[in-house]
A protein has these predicted regions:
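Short, charged, surface-exposed secondary-structure boundary motifs
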Residues: 9-16, 127-129, 260-261
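A structural signal for short, well-ordered beta-strand elements
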Residues: 10, 33, 65, 69, ...
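Conserved N-proximal alpha/beta basic substrate-recognition cap immediately N-terminal to
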Residues: 1-48, 57-58
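Residues at or immediately preceding the N-termini of alpha-helices
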Residues: 14, 37, 68-73, 279-281
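Internal nucleotide-binding/catalytic subdomain
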Residues: 62-185
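Peripheral (often C-terminal) accessory segments that flank ATP-dependent C-N-forming ligase machineries
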Residues: 204-323
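Active-site "cap" helix and flanking loop/linker of ATP-utilizing ligase/carboxylase catalytic domains
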Residues: 142-164, 171, 181-245
Length: 323
């Protein structure tokens, strides 16, 4: 069967992930476990700058930074109200910031094994993504080390799935795994689903525990997140040029009487425009062109998003991550 199996705990149970990382010999950054809103309040009052992450239940809380208590207090008041009787038992993982750049592996994992062709890239948080195809042996050392050390756990847990990592690398060159995605995350799945041309073969073989090698359709991919405030609570009608349908990925997509819509999912992000190319510049240019070609009510995107990802590429080189 295709899917993450029990390996989903590595993404959902962040406290368990820390334990697995330690056992696997991966570095673990300074962090605290806070059980209940009151324990979290007391810790955040004296610890500005830390990052707060939810545990187990996606949607209860999105990761946020505790800039200072004055700013954070209303958020916790609201969270306590929404959690109701669970507010005293909900667990939070609170992490100290780690200096460096965040890079990730994006591809598949079949019982702890990885295809010989891979993609890695940089995300502009909630705005865009840049990815590059390489031979697995040419992946940055930090990404290969994380995969190698997690592989036994993923094999034991039955992972046959899409798989991505967010790994922070800084001056000490150590690979700090921040979060794995044991699924087709967003981004970068909108991009890599087209960057490789034979996912049907990979999924079919992977479901049987066999490895079909990924076949690249291009050398680079770029992705730009599309959003609309209107789409939070309304069906968003989209005018997508027929020739670009392959490059516009819509969440909650439906077609009614020949027209394209994004169904309301309670969030402003409605999908992404992607671009492929034999050079990074070609991929970025194509993504921008495709994003500009789509029309929808209050539809917008960050035209500078990929500049941030490009800056991360240069910063990564300072820490031994060649692009």
């Amino acid at each position: 069967m295709w899917g993450s199996g029990h390996a989903e705990i590595l993404e959902l149970y962040r406290d368990e992930l820390k334990t697995v990382m330690k056992s696997a010999g991966l570095p673990v950054g300074p962090h605290q476990i806070a059980t209940g809103i009151e324990a979290l309040r007391e810790y955040l009052k004296d610890n500005p700058g830390v990052y707060v992450k939810g545990n187990v239940f996606r949607g209860d809380i999105e990761t946020f930074r505790n800039k200072n208590w004055v700013v954070t207090q209303p958020l916790l008041d609201d969270l306590a109200s929404r959690l109701g009787p669970r507010q005293s038992s909900t667990m939070f993982v609170v992490e100290d910031p780690i200096e460096g750049v965040e890079v990730g592996y994006d591809g598949a994992c079949i019982d702890g094994r990885f295809p010989t062709v891979a993609c890695f890239g940089y995300e502009a948080k909630d705005a865009g993504y840049l990815g590059k195809v390489v031979k697995y042996e040419d992946l940055p050392q930090a990404l290969r080390e994380v995969n190698a050390r997690l592989a036994p756990a993923m094999a034991a847990l039955g992972c046959r799935s899409f798989y991505s990592t967010e790994v922070r690398v800084g001056p000490d060159r150590k690979p700090y795994l921040m979060d794995p995605a044991m699924r087709a995350g967003s981004p970068p799945s909108e991009a890599y689903i087209e960057l490789f041309a034979n996912w049907d073969e990979v999924i079919w073989a992977g479901a049987e525990g066999e490895m079909a090698e990924l076949r690249p359709a291009a050398a680079y991919a770029a992705e730009i997140i599309l959003r609309s405030e209107w789409a939070r609570e309304h069906f968003l009608a989209l005018d997508i040029p027929p020739s670009l349908r392959r490059f516009i990925k819509v969440h909650g997509h439906c077609r009614i009487e020949g027209r394209d819509y994004a169904a309301p999912l309670g969030i402003s992000e409605i999908g992404a425009a992607i671009g492929l190319g034999d050079s990074l510049q070609d991929a970025v240019g194509a993504a921008l062109e495709h994003a500009q070609a789509v029309e929808g009510l209050e539809l917008e995107f960050d035209r500078d998003a990929l500049n941030s990802a490009m800056a991360s590429i240069e910063q990564g080189r300072e820490f031994g991550i060649e692009w």
